[in-house]
UniProtKB/Swiss-Prot annotation:
<dbReference type="Pfam" id="PF07676">
    <property type="entry name" value="PD40"/>
</dbReference>
<dbReference type="GO" id="GO:0017038">
    <property type="term" value="P:protein import"/>
</dbReference>
<keyword id="KW-0132">Cell division</keyword>
<dbReference type="GO" id="GO:0042597">
    <property type="term" value="C:periplasmic space"/>
</dbReference>
<keyword id="KW-0131">Cell cycle</keyword>
<comment type="subunit">
    <text>The Tol-Pal system is composed of five core proteins: the inner membrane proteins TolA, TolQ and TolR, the periplasmic protein TolB and the outer membrane protein Pal. They form a network linking the inner and outer membranes and the peptidoglycan layer.</text>
</comment>
<comment type="similarity">
    <text>Belongs to the TolB family.</text>
</comment>
<keyword id="KW-0574">Periplasm</keyword>
<dbReference type="GO" id="GO:0051301">
    <property type="term" value="P:cell division"/>
</dbReference>
<dbReference type="InterPro" id="IPR011659">
    <property type="entry name" value="PD40"/>
</dbReference>
<dbReference type="InterPro" id="IPR007195">
    <property type="entry name" value="TolB_N"/>
</dbReference>
<dbReference type="InterPro" id="IPR011042">
    <property type="entry name" value="6-blade_b-propeller_TolB-like"/>
</dbReference>
<comment type="function">
    <text>Part of the Tol-Pal system, which plays a role in outer membrane invagination during cell division and is important for maintaining outer membrane integrity.</text>
</comment>
<protein>
    <recommendedName>
        <fullName>Tol-Pal system protein TolB</fullName>
    </recommendedName>
</protein>
<keyword id="KW-0732">Signal</keyword>
<feature type="signal peptide">
    <location>
        <begin position="1"/>
        <end position="21"/>
    </location>
</feature>
<dbReference type="InterPro" id="IPR014167">
    <property type="entry name" value="Tol-Pal_TolB"/>
</dbReference>
Length: 442
């Protein structure tokens, strides 16, 4: 509950557009292969209408995960049931879903609502029904209730989705997370906007607006700060901004390139690209003391650092082999190892949270696509089929990647599952959107 309280507090602090998504999500591939699940509308036990339909949030989350396909409510055998006590196992035998989510909402005081939900294993329930002995303790996978305010309905819907997803897959859900990105609208006097929003585009908040370019936002491991590059002072500078206090700290303002910041796993340092000593090289800056350490030293361009989960190595893009490829540098020894060989170029890489895979941009036959490589087998899989993909960022549970691409001549965000089955676009209403970054668990 402490984690949920922290997230809800941040959501209320930053919320500016709670009822409309700043980014639409258009699913383009993969829903047909998803696992069927039933999500019942939560029974409202008050007068008038509830503040928000929590079940709609849950259904949307499960669809966007690429893993589940909620069934049409009209085809469900029971209606208006809000608790496991009303569930009739025998009625659900021919539905074909593996699980059922149901719940209720009732007023619980001034701006307070008691939300209850149950997660039922329909396969176990049906097996018990056939045996003639139905016991909820055998098929009830989870049952919870929480008191929330009207402003917290959407966030608690994401929380329910996280629970359902983890119970059914064994993988932690990432619905209670946020994304950052840059919107560019050249019809405005200050066209560059640094934004954050819920992972699904709701609750968008503008952190900074500038007449000069903003780029490369990245989250701290605790989700409290954002580092980014700003040209607001007519040169590239790296800032770190606290999302709670809005305090901005300038971390790097050397002559030349100051770019591609990446927080260390402990949040104390930034890996960056600087050209202050000549060629672009990789450095690590202590955020508190501003102490700086040079990591690479080569005549070729070294850029786009990212951290391995253990904090002992960096992955980076380098042209030291003649064309952009991904390399690993051990921070203790300084030893550099080439990681990619397949395709013309490989760049913009990051390691998945479990340390087992690498996500990056692969160029083959002139097409830039998002790819995944298993670090054990070295097998590479191209995940996307578009042409100009860039800036991949991995969800904290490692199941999805958000990235920038071009659709109908316009820069948009898109998402793909790390197995390549599910794909979606996230177009913005006005302008173009790029440089996405997925937050850690919040």
């Amino acid at each position: 509950m402490k984690i949920l309280a922290k997230w809800l507090a941040l959501a209320v602090l930053l919320c500016t557009t709670p009822t409309k998504a700043a980014l639409d999500i258009v699913i383009t591939e993969g829903i047909d292969a998803a696992r069927p699940i039933a999500v019942m509308p939560f029974v409202w036990q008050g007068t008038g209408a509830p503040p928000q339909a929590i079940a709609d949030v849950v259904m949307s989350d499960l669809v966007r995960s690429g893993t589940f396909k909620p069934l049409d409510e009209l085809g469900l055998p029971q209606r208006n049931i809000g608790a496991v006590a009303q569930f009739q196992a025998s009625a659900w035998g021919s539905v074909g879903a593996e699980a059922l989510v149901l719940g209720s909402v009732k007023p619980y005081g001034t701006d307070q609502y008691l939300v209850s939900f149950d997660l039922i294993d329909l396969v176990k329930a049906q097996n018990q029904s056939l045996k003639g002995a139905v016991s909820p303790t055998e098929f009830l996978m989870d049952s919870r209730q929480t008191v929330i305010s009207a402003a917290q309905f959407r966030q608690y819907g994401h929380r329910i989705s996280d629970i359902v997803y983890e119970k059914l897959t064994g993988i932690r859900g990432a619905f209670l997370t946020r994304i950052s990105y840059v919107v560019v609208n050249h019809t405005q006097k200050a066209p560059y906007q640094l934004m954050i929003a819920d992972y699904d585009g709701f609750n968008e908040q503008m952190l900074l607006r500038s007449p000069e370019p903003l780029m490369s936002p990245t989250w701290s491991p605790d989700g409290r700060r954002l580092a980014y590059v700003s040209f607001e002072n007519k040169k590239a500078e790296i800032f770190v901004q606290d999302l709670y206090t809005q305090v901005r700290t300038k971390v790097s303002s050397f002559p030349g390139i100051n770019g591609a910041p990446a927080f260390s796993p402990d949040g104390k340092s930034l890996a960056v690209t600087l050209s202050k000593d000549g060629q672009p090289e990789i450095y690590v800056i202590d955020i508190a003391t501003k102490a700086i350490k040079r990591i690479t030293n080569h005549y070729a361009i070294d850029t786009e650092p990212s951290w391995y989960p253990d904090g002992k190595s960096l992955l980076f893009t380098s042209e030291r082999g003649g064309k952009p490829q991904l390399y690993r540098v051990d921070l203790a020894s300084g030893k550099v190892t080439r990681e990619t060989f397949e395709g013309e170029w490989n760049l913009g890489g990051s390691i998945t949270p479990d340390g087992r895979s690498m996500i990056f941009v692969n160029r083959t036959n002139g097409k830039f696509n998002i790819a995944r490589m298993d670090l054990n087998t070295r097998f590479m899989q191209v995940l996307t089929s578009t042409r100009l993909d860039e800036s991949p960022s991995v969800a904290p549970n490692g199941t999805m990647v958000i990235y920038g691409t071009t659709h109908q001549g316009k820069q948009v965000l898109a998402a793909v599952s790390t197995d390549g089955r599910f794909k979606a676009r996230l177009p913005v209403g006005q302008g173009e959107v790029k440089s996405p970054s997925w937050s850690p668990f919040l």
